[in-house]
């Protein structure tokens, strides 16, 4: 009995905190919810002065309402990093509570690949959609992003690790979520978009530490 209990405890811990190779897989959020999400664990030890985030997602919500794509909160700032879709506008990108917009003239229902980067030294933001760059913009020059973070997929955090609204939740698939603590070059982003090799050092989809809450499923990815 003691051996069985020990096995169950170890299995539970492995599910919550162990590393998983998520290659060719995606998290599926099948319905609107304020309780379903995925929490990602990142080995950050110091504040970020630059970063790049790349991922795939697939949803039918874009012409209906806004939704959160990537939410990185700290105890001082719930929108430390936020990638959000704003209906009738396009992509909203936030660092340290300050927001800029990248308009999308036409919305189609198809898997989308995005990469976005920011650096403190210049404040320059780059935003790439399906391998194509938008015009560079500037945001929060001189700012540093906190390291003690709650990173959530599927919900927007209005407080550290919680206070979700179902009307901002993602309904659909998300995968290939990777993050670096530096700005990737255009050639590197193009390589990632085409499926080439990469070595993320903050979040690595091929060695992902995560915990699922609520109704979220892991399924084969639907994009190439």
Swiss-Prot record:
Record-level Gene Ontology MF annotations: calcium ion binding; choline binding; complement component C1q complex binding; identical protein binding; low-density lipoprotein particle binding; low-density lipoprotein particle receptor binding
Disulfide pattern: 54-115
Binding site for Ca(2+) 2: 156, 158, 168
Induction pattern: The concentration of CRP in plasma increases greatly during acute phase response to tissue injury, infection or other inflammatory stimuli. It is induced by IL1/interleukin-1 and IL6/interleukin-6.
Modification type Pyrrolidone carboxylic acid: residues: 19
Record-level GO BP terms: acute-phase response; defense response to Gram-positive bacterium; inflammatory response; innate immune response; negative regulation of lipid storage; negative regulation of macrophage derived foam cell differentiation; negative regulation of mononuclear cell proliferation; opsonization
Entry note: cofactor: Binds 2 calcium ions per subunit.
Protein name, per record: C-reactive protein
Source organism per UniProt: Homo sapiens
